[in-house]
C-alpha cells in the first residue's frame, strides 16, 4: 500500500480532483486546508515571528491511501495535471504504508 500526499493551491483542487476521479478504482481522498511557508521567505533575512507568520500562504492537502498499482496510476495522473504549473504551486509525494485498517461503522 502507498499513501499519496498532494499539496496544491486551492484553485487547483478541482482540476486534481477530476483527474484522480477519472482513474478506475479511485478509492476516495481526504482534503484539508493547510498553510505553506515559501522557501524564499526564509532566505529574506531576519524577521520577527509576527512578520514570519504573515508570510504563510494557503494550500490544500490531499491524502490518498491505495494499493501499489493504483497509487502509481493516481500519482502519475496528478503529476500530469500539475506539471505545467509555476514553481511552488504544488508538491506531490508517495510513501509506503506498512499497515492500515479501514474502519466501517454499520447499523
Name every feature range the model reports, one short phrase each.
Residues 1-107:
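Positively charged, small/polar-rich N-terminal and surface patches that mediate targeting and assembly
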Amino acid at each position: 500500500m502507498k499513501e499519496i500526499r498532494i499539496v496544491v493551491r486551492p484553485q487547483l483542487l478541482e482540476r486534481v480532483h477530476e483527474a484522480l476521479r477519472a482513474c478506475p478504482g479511485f478509492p476516495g481522498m481526504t482534503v484539508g486546508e493547510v498553510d505553506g511557508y515559501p522557501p524564499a521567505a526564509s532566505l529574506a533575512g531576519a524577521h520577527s515571528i509576527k512578520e514570519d507568520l504573515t508570510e504563510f500562504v494557503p494550500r490544500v492537502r490531499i491524502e490518498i491511501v491505495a494499493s501499489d498499482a493504483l497509487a502509481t496510476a493516481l500519482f502519475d495522473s496528478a503529476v500530469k495535471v500539475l506539471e505545467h504549473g509555476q514553481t511552488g504551486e504544488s508538491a506531490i509525494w508517495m510513501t509506503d504504508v506498512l499497515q492500515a485498517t479501514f474502519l466501517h461503522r454499520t447499523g
